[in-house]
């Protein structure tokens, strides 16, 4: 027998009351986005489950993709069949025969939501267990901690049989907690921050600052590929490229070296906030980790934050660098993040940046700039690209091959 579908069990959605179906429908849409590379599959949801019909597609890559989607508590490859006792008996016998080995223990666990079905749960357990003994007389039944728990569900539309339960990513479906703008440089920390924001249901749009010719096409492709990795957790992400060359040159030419980083970050924050307002976001997300670099001391954060009243979410703010690296490796962004392309945060970096910048000094130095004009020109020059889940090739590897 081949699996018919993957049955997805919802996570925290069961606690969402009147909004439950909104959360479930969002999860369904996210699953459809993530599984877009598999055109044969079909997705439908009800209040208790989401069903991914395989329609002949190999189940293993579908399972691997679904395991990453936020809002999925658990999933099981299942056999779907008509609600017929003879069909159930044959299916259970075939499945257990294929799984059997010496010393194997099992139990049948039936759940019947269709109360019009001819047998109740206890009767089905007894009947199907007896059917297994008919073909496997040496097998042992065990009610506590068996090797195999064969789950049989009798629902209104069909019967379902499964024996695997695979842990999902948990969290909330992406898009159920509003929209935020993720400041993504291309380093290790910001993709991890984006991942953690996605886990709590935030619909992120990625804001990436590019300063050609100081930053290369490779740096831009790297940021887009990091964004593509994040699409695996909840579907498509809008990637917003911000032209930043003019501003960085202005800062380099007119500001004291010690304040280059502070002023650069203040401009980035202003621009991100303007894009957030334009695109109806609610928060800004970044990868700042307290004390990790000069721009991430409390004094620096205070001086940079002063340009906006928008809430700033910093998911990795209390994490050690090693913890962030381990999470980046776990979510498969680390190898991309360490590719040697310079970004806006590394070009023009001063040798001795100010670790305790004064807000008054930053504001005084900014009097040398046409702040509104610079911000307006940057925002009007943004390029928005929809990033969809990757299908086959790692685009960064392809880019490197092309450059060599």
From Swiss-Prot:
CDD domains: PPase_ThiI (cd01712), THUMP_ThiI (cd11716). Keywords: ATP-binding, Cytoplasm, Nucleotide-binding, RNA-binding, Thiamine biosynthesis, Transferase, tRNA-binding. One of its GO terms (cellular component) is cytosol. Residues 60-165 form the THUMP domain. It is an enzyme of class 2 (transferase). It catalyses: [ThiI sulfur-carrier protein]-S-sulfanyl-L-cysteine + a uridine in tRNA + 2 reduced [2Fe-2S]-[ferredoxin] + ATP + H(+) = [ThiI sulfur-carrier protein]-L-cysteine + a 4-thiouridine in tRNA + 2 oxidized [2Fe-2S]-[ferredoxin] + AMP + diphosphate; [ThiS sulfur-carrier protein]-C-terminal Gly-Gly-AMP + S-sulfanyl-L-cysteinyl-[cysteine desulfurase] + AH2 = [ThiS sulfur-carrier protein]-C-terminal-Gly-aminoethanethioate + L-cysteinyl-[cysteine desulfurase] + A + AMP + 2 H(+). Pathway: Cofactor biosynthesis; thiamine diphosphate biosynthesis. It is found in: Cytoplasm. Coiled coil: none annotated. ATP binds at residues 183-184, 208-209, 265, 287, 296. The keyword Coiled coil does not apply. Its EC number is 2.8.1.4. Its main location: cytoplasm. One of its GO terms (biological process) is thiazole biosynthetic process. One of its GO terms (molecular function) is tRNA-uracil-4 sulfurtransferase activity. Belongs to the ThiI family. NCBIfam families: tRNA uracil 4-sulfurtransferase ThiI. PANTHER family: TRNA SULFURTRANSFERASE (PTHR43209:SF1). Catalyzes the ATP-dependent transfer of a sulfur to tRNA to produce 4-thiouridine in position 8 of tRNAs, which functions as a near-UV photosensor. Also catalyzes the transfer of sulfur to the sulfur carrier protein ThiS, forming ThiS-thiocarboxylate. This is a step in the synthesis of thiazole, in the thiamine biosynthesis pathway. The sulfur is donated as persulfide by IscS. This is Probable tRNA sulfurtransferase. It comes from Streptococcus pyogenes serotype M12 (strain MGAS9429).
């Amino acid at each position: 027998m081949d699996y018919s579908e993957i049955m997805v069990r919802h996570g925290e959605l069961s606690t969402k009351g009147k909004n439950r179906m909104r959360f479930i429908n969002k999860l369904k849409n996210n699953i459809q986005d993530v599984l877009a590379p598999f055109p044969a599959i079909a997705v439908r949801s009800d209040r208790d489950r989401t069903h991914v019909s395989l329609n002949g597609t190999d189940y293993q890559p579908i399972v691997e993709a679904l395991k990453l989607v936020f809002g999925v508590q658990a999933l099981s490859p299942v056999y779907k069949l008509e609600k017929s006792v003879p069909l159930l008996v044959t299916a259970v016998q075939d499945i257990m025969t294929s799984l059997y080995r010496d010393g194997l223990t099992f139990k049948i666990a039936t759940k019947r939501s269709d109360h019009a079905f001819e047998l109740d749960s206890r009767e089905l357990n007894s009947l199907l267990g007896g059917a297994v003994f008919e073909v496997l007389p040496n097998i042992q039944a065990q009610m506590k901690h068996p090797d195999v728990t064969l789950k049989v569900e009798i629902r209104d539309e069909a019967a379902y049989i499964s024996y695997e339960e695979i842990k999902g990513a948990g969290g909330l479906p992406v898009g159920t907690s509003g929209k935020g703008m993720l400041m993504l440089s291309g380093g290790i920390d910001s993709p991890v921050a984006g991942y953690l924001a996605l886990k709590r249901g935030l619909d992120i749009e990625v804001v990436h600052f590019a300063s050609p010719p100081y930053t290369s096409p490779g740096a831009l492709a790297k940021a887009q590929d990091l964004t593509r990795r994040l699409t695996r957790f909840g579907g498509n992400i809008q990637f917003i490229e911000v032209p930043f060359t003019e501003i960085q040159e202005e800062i380099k030419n007119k500001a004291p070296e010690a304040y280059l980083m502070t002023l650069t970050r203040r401009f980035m924050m202003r621009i991100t906030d303007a894009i957030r307002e334009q695109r109806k976001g609610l928060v800004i997300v970044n990868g700042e980790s307290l004390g990790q670099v000069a721009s991430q001391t409390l004094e620096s954060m205070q001086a940079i934050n002063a340009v906006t009243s928008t809430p700033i979410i910093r998911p990795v703010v209390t994490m050690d660098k090693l913890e962030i690296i381990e999470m980046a490796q776990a979510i498969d962004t680390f190898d991309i993040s360490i590719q040697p392309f310079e970004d806006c945060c590394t070009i023009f970096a001063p040798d001795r940046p100010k670790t305790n910048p004064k807000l008054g000094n930053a504001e005084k130095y900014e009097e040398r700039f046409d702040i509104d004009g610079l911000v307006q020109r940057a925002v009007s020059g943004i390029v928005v690209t929809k990033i969809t889940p990757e299908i086959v090739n790692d685009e960064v590897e392809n880019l490197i091959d092309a450059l060599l």
